[in-house]
């Protein structure tokens, strides 16, 4: 089980950053399923413990930040832009899709709670059998990410450069990263 090396886009490209995070979501969700198989064959050895630690770190830190990026910044901006576009049917469709994926966040958080408890035990060296929720988590999270990309992120063209810069700045702040006020994308936001 190997970690996925990845160079992420900068916060000046917030949609690309969110999509890159989805690649990591897919990777770590799959890895949780692979870990269950690995444990059956090799037990909770050092590699299994390290893998559990990495999955925990990703979904405990990056996962909640990603949902906050969407729920606090991207989704409200897209809702407002869709409503302002004057295309009421398209705005209703986009707002409905946003409502649905936000509901999925709650379901995914519940699945994560079960998977998390199991991973914490594996990290401590206990070769516990994976809960049924691991397979559901490993399938549902990547499907959710694909849905967001196909039904929501594709509408990022509704946003202005200033709105995207504001989203990127808020993503940076959420992660404790310093924004350069001389950067025109940041200064205009």
Give, region by region, the residue ranges found by the protein language model:
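Small-residue-biased structural context
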Residues: 1-189
């Amino acid at each position: 089980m190997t970690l996925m090396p990845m160079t992420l886009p900068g916060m000046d490209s917030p949609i690309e950053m969110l999509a890159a995070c989805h690649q990591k979501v897919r990777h770590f969700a799959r890895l949780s399923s692979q870990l269950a198989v690995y444990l059956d064959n090799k037990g909770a050895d050092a590699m299994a413990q390290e893998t559990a630690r990495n999955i925990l770190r990703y979904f405990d830190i990056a996962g909640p930040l990603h949902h906050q990026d969407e729920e606090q910044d991207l989704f409200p901006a897209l809702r407002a832009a869709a409503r302002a576009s004057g295309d009421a049917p398209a705005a209703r469709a986009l707002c409905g899709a946003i409502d649905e994926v936000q509901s999925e966040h709650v379901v995914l958080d519940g699945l994560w709670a079960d998977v998390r408890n199991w991973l914490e035990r594996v990290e401590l060296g206990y070769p516990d059998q994976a809960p049924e929720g691991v397979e559901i988590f490993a399938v549902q999270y990547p499907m959710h990410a694909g849905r967001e990309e196909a039904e929501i992120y594709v509408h990022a063209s509704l946003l202005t450069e200033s709105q995207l810069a504001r989203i990127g700045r808020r993503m940076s702040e959420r992660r404790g990263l310093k924004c350069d006020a001389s950067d025109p994308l940041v200064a205009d936001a």
